[in-house]
From Swiss-Prot:
This is Phosphoribosyl-AMP cyclohydrolase. PANTHER family: HISTIDINE BIOSYNTHESIS BIFUNCTIONAL PROTEIN, HISTIDINE BIOSYNTHESIS BIFUNCTIONAL PROTEIN HIS7. Catalyzes the hydrolysis of the adenine ring of phosphoribosyl-AMP. GO terms for biological process: L-histidine biosynthetic process. It is found in: Cytoplasm. Binds 1 Mg(2+) ion per subunit.
Amino acid sequence: MNQNLLWFEKLKFNNQDLIPAIAQDYRDGTVLMMAWMNSESIQKTLSTGEAHYWSRSRSQLWHKGATSGHIQKVKELFYDCDGDTILLKVEQIGDIACHTGARSCFFNAVPIYPQS
């Protein structure tokens, strides 16, 4: 295996051969979205420099923004200490990551009521 891909062997995919991937704005740290990746989408992301995910609903490779134009240019890729989550630091073209038209998919705030 290519020395540059030795890290890939450390990844822990679930029983569907998927791994969660968080997309984060590389400039301000905003968490934009969570999606699933498989080995094919990771390889495609690395070879193109643009985020590719695995669509569980369509069971196919998904080039983020291919239809909308809101592609994600990957600036950095990390994996966590357990090897079971990927973090993509991206430049979000068009400043829209969510299919709802929002910048981030995480716009549903839940109030926290500390217990006394």
